[in-house]
């Protein structure tokens, strides 16, 4: 996907125009323009030069940008400063203009004697002040008329036409009044003085500038999360070059470089510890505040903070391949895409401005035909032009997506695209892979059952001595228990691993063995006791590791992949949301049922082979929108097949690449949080679109004078004020998403 900066856009009509122009370029398969960030995402084989040329022909500017530049492009500080200057300067001259145009009606002190009865001087002063304000805000006229010439009128065109119409008619009225005064027709002079709309033209420009400034400030807030991620990126690294430690820009670090990180420093790139021990704060990536101990062979990530010892690391992933860069790209790409619901606004935006101009012209003609004065008719037409707001339509969706995406990023929930944000809230079924998702993904000792006259320590001593030599996954659970209890083990002679059965060896000349029921029962005389405890452990959904010494049963160790602490809570939250929760596992039905009951799922599908998960998901999708949650390589096909694939962040890169949503904290409760966030974001988009459509549906007829019979009319100045605030309201409403309760905490306290 190629990214471009777009210059000159002021409203949704602009973005629609650019999108339409670029979509016609040969080789472009898809194009999405984001009005919020003034950026464009293009997929296809088209050359940069052809794309930039198409944008230029549409009346705008374009330049190619790199991923690392994206957040910098979201900065709004630079446009706000000149807007603020324009607004303050315009406001000063506007107040002076209002003083002359409304004199004693507005101010308590009189006009200078020069203007006493001098209507021409009064009119010329208003004209001059209006010209000054128009020059200050010339951007609207340059952009508006340039777009009109290119056949792509935008919001600036509406403002420019409205201000020009008000100024033009007022200038005509001033000329007519001057002519009447020279002729001595004072009645006509008074009439034309009432037709001055200089203050309307000035007020339109000043209020629209204020609205744009507030909008830009609010839009800047929506990109705070993305900018915050960028700011995490370290700027330099201490690498070993030619045997010496040198400080270089992080961009110069290459894969394989050896770098040193001291306490308090950020880790510059993803790597692996080769020397030293430390505790690393990974909260910037995972959200977990507890530091993680690091020792040789442990991996470290860019932008995490080394808190204690000095560590020497080897660079594994640099530049755009680091975890931080991938997160930034994911957040940025998600904000650059559009959900399906945005298509409605896009279609309307494409014809909005020409339609408004046509309505304004028709409004003027109709009022003139009815017999109203030219001033009244033109005022109604100007009101139509300046109250109409395509920006509110254009911003309704992208601001909500940006804020919702940022809210997710701050909580370790990453959506890969806008469609994922939109669809996650519509889920009816959530399928959870058992291993590593519901459970810890590693076996642990859950029970120790020594035989009569045998202590736990004696049993663990023999078990640990045997399992120390084994490479079986279950051996790790026993060895971990041995280390935890600090039990010493003995060397084993004649060790032999029997696949499918168990382990055999000698300790101090005595034959010892460990394994499954079938293997041990064939070599012991205590079959009844052995069977009872084996059945008990198996019925609990655990794996019995049975041990014997000198043909006598000495005890059983129960091993199981236990469920995570938050699994039951996570499943419970999903069920409360009306979602059907399914657990997928390769275990037998008996074991799967026990784990499923402990987790609280609605349905258990057992005996699912790795390559069969995709087929199970396909069947579930027939019953409703389905999400697959997993973390392993064998989950990738199912993650891709599901309506929404959700990867647990601690899983493999393959699973993360295949998913639509990534949970960085590896916390299952974030599945429910992602659904709540999606629902909140979609609700916010609906609110924004409703406001945008409702505002224009009511505002345009009101401005046109459709309710004059009811005594309701709209002065162009109030129309401009409404327009300037409409976009601000949309953006401000989107910012409310930052307060969304995605973890359901408020309900618990009510």
Locations of regions flagged by a protein language model:
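Flexible metal-binding regulatory segments at protein termini and peripheral loops
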Residues: 1-123, 244-245, 325, 329-337, ...
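Conserved ATP-binding TGD loop and adjacent catalytic N/P-domain core of P-type ATPases
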Residues: 16, 29, 337, 344, ...
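Conserved cytosolic catalytic loops of P-type ATPases
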Residues: 25-49, 53, 195-196, 227-321, ...
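Transmembrane helix-loop-helix hairpins at the membrane interface
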Residues: 82-236, 347, 716
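ATP-driven catalytic headpiece of P-type ATPases
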Residues: 85, 304, 425-471, 501-582, ...
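Membrane-embedded alpha-helical bundles of multi-pass transporters
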Residues: 106-120, 149, 168, 407, ...
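Juxtamembrane coupling segments of multi-pass membrane pumps/enzymes
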Residues: 185-187, 202-263, 294, 344, ...
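Conserved catalytic phosphorylation-site environment of P-type ATPases
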Residues: 285, 344, 379, 392-466, ...
